[in-house]
Design a protein with these regions (language model features):
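Alpha-helical transmembrane segments and their immediate juxtamembrane cytosolic regions
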Residues: 1-231
Length: 231
């Protein structure tokens, strides 16, 4: 039976993102300076929430099945996300930046050495699915031992303190982040995916516990940001 709560959550997130983009493109910042904070707040909330939903979807659609049975569908999802990135990235370079549609323009996108704007989230979802394929046995364990998501998330969160200035390879930036490229790094966002996997099928008490842990981590991150700024 399909879990409609995931669809509802994703629908709400899509509406929020559309609202944020409308404010970003058509809002009058001079008259309404608070628009910046609304756009930033929604943007900071939306992608982690989408990754959380992606984890829930993976748990429902793939992780309940044996690996050989789940692999073809996971592979198709990875392929669709990757193809969407290629199409979106090429369209951005050609239609928005007016670059010629030639091999030189496409080569960097195909090799992931060129990450065009407005396409970063697509390659992030492709790499998240690839990570789910590689880590399939571990993710299956989380569906049974849901507390595992927390110790597995801590090393990922420590990735927030990596020396981003030294990460200059675009393919590595997709995995770990960088100040040279706009990316949604898989390492730092993977805890949201793990939480989505653990949340699926959890009891009410387990979900309350996960919510409490999320509040604690969020509060700690906010305190760090106020005192030290971004890493």
């Amino acid at each position: 039976m399909r879990d409609r709560s995931v669809d509802l959550q994703r629908g709400i997130l899509v509406i929020l993102m559309l609202y944020a983009h409308l404010l970003q493109f058509f809002g009058d910042l001079q008259r309404f300076p608070s628009i910046h904070f609304w756009v930033m707040g929604i943007s900071l909330l939306a992608f982690p929430a989408f990754v959380f939903c992606f984890g829930r979807t993976a748990a429902l659609a793939y992780l309940k099945k044996p690996f050989r049975q789940a692999l073809p569908r996971m592979g198709r999802t990875f392929g669709r996300c990757l193809a969407a990135f290629y199409v979106s990235g090429a369209a951005f370079r050609v239609l928005r930046e007016h670059r010629p549609l030639e091999a030189e323009t496409l080569r960097g996108i195909l090799l992931l050495s060129d990450i065009p704007g407005w396409s970063e989230f697509l390659i992030a979802f492709a790499l998240l699915m690839l990570s789910a394929i590689v880590l399939f046995p571990l993710l299956r364990q989380i569906t049974c031992r849901r507390w595992l998501w927390l110790p597995l998330s801590i090393p990922c969160l420590l990735g927030c303190f990596l020396p981003y200035d030294r990460i200059t390879v675009p393919q590595l930036a997709l995995l770990m982040g960088s100040r040279s490229y706009v990316t949604f790094p898989v390492l730092q966002y993977f805890p949201f995916f793990l939480a989505g996997v653990a949340y699926t099928g959890a009891s009410f008490r387990e979900r309350l516990g996960m919510g409490g842990v999320a509040v604690i981590f969020s509060a700690a991150g906010l305190v760090w940001y106020v005192r030290h700024g971004l890493p």
